[in-house]
Structure formats: structure tokens, C-alpha cells
Amino acid sequence: AWVLITQAREGNKLRGYSFCTLERIGGTPSLLVGLALVDRTSRAESALKAIMADQYRRALLAFPDEDVLLGTRLLTPEGFRAFNGLQDVVPFPGHKSSGEERAWARRLSKRFGCESRLDDRTFVLKGDGSVAGGLDFVAPKVKIPEGVETHFDSFKADRGDRLVAFGWAMAEDLAGGRLGR
């Protein structure tokens, strides 16, 4: 696995950062975001876009001509903005997850070191009070996909609850530079 750090800066100010890896999980090219934080300002969305664009650029270099799975743990519904432009994002409101999708949630939670805490029907990792990584993104006036907040109804982020989410970056979208913009 490659450990990669991405920073989003505005002048001298650090506006966001992420730690991710590019690896193959069972042969599948994967971009795993272990930790990402974006300042909670009016410019938060542009910082998130810059971070994701850099990660997609790296994924293209590592896995040319291949679809890449983006997987992470979300703290808030706004975190779904990181999946803009991706295909088959899971979980999604009103969608009954298939066995293969639940298997991917288990693989990702195992990779994140918390497989025993995953409810593979809801994709929620139950917190145990310890520090837990994930994608922390909140921005004023950000538009989130309708209904995703239902995944966070019984959610306690301060306890360490996280939502395992993933989607597919298509090879042609990576090559065309259309993701993260």
C-alpha cells in the first residue's frame, strides 16, 4: 500500500488534508481514504474538491485504464459530496444492498481495522468511544443527496460511529479528469 497525504491550501492557510492509500483489495484497484478533514468555512467545498481531484489524479497514475473503488468512513451526510461523479455509490436511501455490496462493506471495514463493529445491513460502524478516523466534511449551504441523512439518524459521531461508504470511479472519468471538479 502507498501512504499518500494530500493538502488543500489557500495561500499560507491549510484548509484541508487527507491520508489515503492506493492498493488492490482482492485484485480490485482501490482508493481508501482513512482520514480527511476540511475546515468548516464557506470555502470548504472547494477544499474538498481539490483534495479529491488530487487523489483521483494519483489513482489514474497507479491504475491506468481501470475502474477504481473509492472507500471511506463518513462522519456526516455532507461527506457524500466526496462521491460526486462516481457510479454505484453505496449505501443510498431506498436501496436494498446486495450481497456483493455488503461484502465490500465488510472488506473495507476489515481494512479500516473495525470489522467486528460493522452492521452490514446499515453499513454503520458502531463506535466504542475510541478515536476513529473518517472523512470529516461539513460546509454551509452544501447540497447533499436527498435522503442520505437517514443513514445518520441513530448515529453518534462523538462516540466513534461511522458510515462505511463506497463508489466506483470509472476509468474514462478518471482519464478525462472529470472527477473532483
What positions do the PLM features span?
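Short amphipathic alpha-helical surface micro-motifs
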Residues: K13-F19, A50-Q55, I144-H151
